[in-house]
Amino acid sequence: MKRAAIPLILLVSGFVLGLLCSVSLRHPAAATPAAVIQKEETPSESAVNTTSLLHTAAAVTNALHDQDYETLSTYVHPTRGVTFTPYSTVALQRDQNFTVDQIKNLSSDTSTYTWGYEDGRGESIQMTMSEYFARFVFDADYTQAPKVGVDQIITSGNALENLTEAYPDCHFVDFCYPSRDPANEGLDWCSLKLVFLGEKTSWYLVGVVHGEWTI
């Protein structure tokens, strides 16, 4: 798949994302990981890839919203798994990586993992998978995110944004709340960046990068 020459920023309402989710989740229950993408002759290949990427990303956010980890696991890369980053800066050697089966059985996993270090405090983040997902994955309803960027980071703060360097062979979708309460003047922004590897006609989830305002 060819990467678009110019990053594309899309402003997508929650209603439109809902429509994308309804289309994406029509893949067969027994399908292999990731949604199967049908090739079309028109529009251009890059446009088709962007559309299919958004459909897959919307399906992933919908599965997260519903805590449907069995469906979520069908999008995880079968050999690379999926890596979780709590604060914008990706560190593949340190960040936790999980397999398809681990994601599928997420709700029953009571083990405590070290996910990184808390911003401002420096204490290690010790959480179960369910606890981490509630705090550093779906900390807002990203199915209703007011801004969505394709291969474009919408909002950033003090943390180093190195997603494209960490995943040079991938594409990503940024679901972002630039501000959740106008009174906070943007200091409460948060985002969920889903990183996908394209292989033939499929998009596979390989990274989940959470972002928020940091000290």
Model-assigned labels for residue ranges:
Residues 131, 135, 140-215:
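Short beta-strand edge/turn micro-motifs at domain boundaries
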Residues 8-19:
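Hydrophobic membrane-insertion alpha-helices, especially the h-region
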Residues 76-80, 86-88, 119, 177-179, ...:
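A mature extracytoplasmic/lumenal domain signature
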Residues 79-149:
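Surface-exposed acidic loop/strand-edge motifs in secreted or periplasmic proteins
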Residues 1-4:
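Positively charged n-region of N-terminal signal peptides that target proteins for export
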Residues 19-31:
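Hydrophobic single-pass membrane-insertion segments
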